[in-house]
Amino acid sequence: MGKRKFKAESQKLLDMVINSIYSQREVFLRELISNASDAIDKIYYKALTDDSLSFDVDNYYIKITPNKEERTLTVVDTGIGMTKEELENNLGVIAKSGSHTFKSENEIKDGHDIIGQFGVGFYAAFMVADKVEVVTKSIDSDAAFKWESKGSDGYSITEADKQDIGTTITLYIKENQEEENYDEFLDTFTLQQIIKKYSDFIRYPIKMDVTESKLKEGSEDEYEDVVEEQTINTMVPIWKKNKSELTDDDYTNFYQEKRYGFDKPLKHVHINVDGSIRYNAILFIPESAPFNYYTRDYEKGLELYSNGVLIMDKCADLLPDYFSFVKGMVDSEDLSLNISREMLQHDRQLKLIAKNIKKKVKQQLVSLLRDERENYEKFFDAFGQQIKFGVYSDYGQNKDELKDLLLFYSSKEKKLVTLEEYVSCMPEDQKYIYYATGDSRDRIEKLPQTELVADKGYEILYFTDEIDEFAIKMLMNYDEKEFRSVSSGDLGIEEDEKEENEQENNDNAELFTAMKEVLSTKVKDVRASKRLKSHPVVLTADGEISLEMEKIINAMPDDQQIQADKVLEINVNHDIFQSLKAAQGNDDEKFKLYTNLLYNQALLIEGLPINDPVEFTNDICKVMV
């Protein structure tokens, strides 16, 4: 047969395959291997209904052979082969899938499934090859044929000399171009990596001749290069093995082989689902966070396989952001893929899988918290901020899902506690869940604001992460108990203490007004403190914006500046208050000096910046002389 032209629509589609459909050139090998696997599967299915055929799996394989000198890459399979008519129909018409036709005409059982469905994967070879030759002999034909094409200019089919049933595809690899290195597809190591990445779990052996340096026989120090045929792929995926056969070491080895992390996983979840959509999954909860986890460079997602063939490195849609630390894979036979096999046509299937994965991860974390507290605390130390972010993000729509996974350090227990544990230990007269914010536990313990709450014997939660208070503001309450900062204006104290405090404010109203005039817009109010015992002064905040929030938001790089409504609280029982009263009306300069010093002192205690450090140090010097 002379050269024949592709149909006009086929020429356009071929151009799309070469230039547009696939995002990475290396997937051509995945497509050719998947086609080869399909060809062997077809013999298996044929043997189920044809008594004259036997199927011994040991006789079936795929072999990849690069030749750098001739710039060829050969893919051989011992599958069903193609007749002349099938060559014409399957390779002469682009997007005509022989595998799809075979599946339509044969009932597929026994857990096998043929991969191909669109009929374009073969043409991905033209992304890396100037010319492609296919020599094939069908199980249903005594003659062999060669299909040959250089791409869009057409193809030819001629008789060929081939004795064994199966197909040999030879790619004539392109010469290197300025921005494209095609030599890599002739490199044995690179080809091995591509096979392991995309086709590691193809059910038939993928073989290559591999050159290794070995000690010469009888020699102690002389080596020689030895060529050995090796099977590159794993073939049987761990997720299709019975869970009872697998040990923790098996899961750990898989975790490390797939390079999900360099540590050991803290926990694994093995999922097998046979329902409206069938899938298998192995999920891992890492022991530690990757170095870039809390940066924009980190990419979440699970490996997504279709019939054991990798189609996505990181499928982000399978995980909610708050579980982005989860590593692992999902394999399904029921995914509706697009023409490139790199994206899904419908997201309903993915949403069903993602919903179940979220549920399974939550169950595993709850189990870890309940039964392995030490390991859960190790997990929370690494990924707790992400759980808190999940409470805060999306306007708190996931807060009920995550609130029982939160841990905070307790002032009384001197360890991490859950919100449920905190509430269960609250005295009957305690109205609120109290918390204090700061850079560290040590710093929080020294805060003047904690004195009154601690003296009453109430437990205080320590918030040391920047996200903590934002998450709690979104949570609002737990078990109908509101959260209350120890720096807030109302701590829920007894009425008699309120009356005493109001009396102190009335008695010193003139002094507090004078202090407020000195500080001008720096504070909303100056008042007597009901919380201080030994410290002279403290800053608190009225309203929703706390002092800690002001500090965090103002430190962000977007130049967004906010200001909390600050209240300067004075301990009227402290000696310095008497000095302040003595200066009022008698020495205006000293009164102004003391007022500014107390305000700046309160700023320092809160970790807030002083507007004029030079003036502050000069004021200290004035007091000292």
Curated annotation (Swiss-Prot):
GO terms for cellular component: cytoplasm. Residues 552-625 are annotated as: C. Residues 342-551 are annotated as: B. It is found in: Cytoplasm. It comes from the Bacteria. InterPro entries: HATPase_C_sf, Heat_shock_protein_90_CS, HSP90_C, Hsp90_fam, Hsp90_N, Ribosomal_Su5_D2-typ_SF. This is Chaperone protein HtpG. It comes from Oceanobacillus iheyensis (strain DSM 14371 / CIP 107618 / JCM 11309 / KCTC 3954 / HTE831). The lineage of its organism: Bacteria, Bacillati, Bacillota, Bacilli, Bacillales. The gene is htpG.
